[in-house]
Structures are given as C-alpha cells and as structure tokens.
C-alpha cells in the first residue's frame, strides 16, 4: 500500500479545504508548504503524514472540523478547563485542537484510520494518539479513567454503533457533543447522487431516530443545532449536546427538530 497521496486530495482529507478545487487554487497560489518547501502542483505525491501548512491560513485549528466544536462551546455551557476528553473519529484533529485551545488537559484522540492526526498534535504531550483503534472495542480500563467530555465526528458508521460505547467512557457529570450526519444515518435509498441528503424530511427522520436512541442510552438532549460548516460533499450536518442528567433536558419533539432543520436549510 502506498504511503503517499496527491497533495490536493490530502489537503481535503485533512479537512483543510472543503473541495479539491479550493485546494488546487491554494496550491496554485503558492500557499501550500511541506515543512519549509513550497509545493505548487496539485498532483504532487506527498507522504500521508507530511507536515503541511497553509500560508496565510486564517483557520484557527488544524482542520475545519474545529469550527464545529467551536460553535457548540460557544452556545452551550461546555467548560473544558482542565477537562479530560475523548475525541471519537479524531481524523486530522480539528476537534482535539479546538478542545486544547479551550483548556482541555488531556485528549484521547481515537480513530480507526492512521497517519491522519496533524503533526503539531502528534507532538503535543496532552494528546494520546489512539490510531488504528475501533471505538467499539475501547473500554474505560483501556483509558485508565472516565472522562469529562466526549466529541464524536465519525463517517461511514451510524451513531447507534458509537453512543453505547461512548456512554461507558463518560463520567456521570460529563457531557458529549455528537455530529449527526444524515448521509451516514439514512438508508441508502434516501441518499442522493454524490452521497448528499437534501430532503429536509430525511433530516428530520434521522434526528428523531438518533435523539431517541441517545435517550435510550441515557444520554439526554440539552441542545440541538446545525453545523456551522457543511460536510466535504456539501451535506448539512447537525450537532447534538448531551449529558447524563435528565434535569432540564429538552423534550424530543417534532417542533424542536423541524425548527432546527428549517433553520439549517435557510442558510
């Protein structure tokens, strides 16, 4: 198996750009560097774990994913000061980076893939890099502790395979933010061309099912909104904020779900 990938593809895979076209534009503009060397050809094959930087990049995190967690932190009472966290589906580490910048003291960065976590996070002693690790096999004993906070951003797997494990890793006083991705939750017949779900009724069905499933896992809804950025294929995604406390939890109603979906489609 090759350990190299086209530069434009790698930049998208790392969440630095939402499309190959935008990645290519940045490459042609001379904005992409591997270590201190500028790379100006989109087709250049580079190591999948290369240290890539974007000159003039205004993104505050190692990937766009950090903006998703940032929104949740801004609108919900999430205090990560000195928190121990699990980042499920860490990938490049956007959520991990955001959490660290907001005070987290330790992050278990878990992903079934490998050679994806950003170089700066690999070097950060606060980050425990758990690559090649299927979350469904992770136990509290493996971590050595229960955690204060969990973030979930997974692909090609439903949250109904992840939430039951996540709740076993979380303290009773902890909280969890999950990215709900309709393209991986809806049946294949409801996913459109290019893997995009545009039907708001499908969005509502997915949210209803996942929120009820979380409730059955004793993860109670305390906030629901839409992601501030779309997925790489242009999919609308949603953010659920949960705790293990049923006190002041939101009721999972059609009105709540419809309002959030309508707002997401209005953008």
Language-model regions, residue ranges each:
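A basic, amphipathic helix-loop patch mediating RNA/tRNA/ribosome contacts
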Residues: 1-50, 84-85
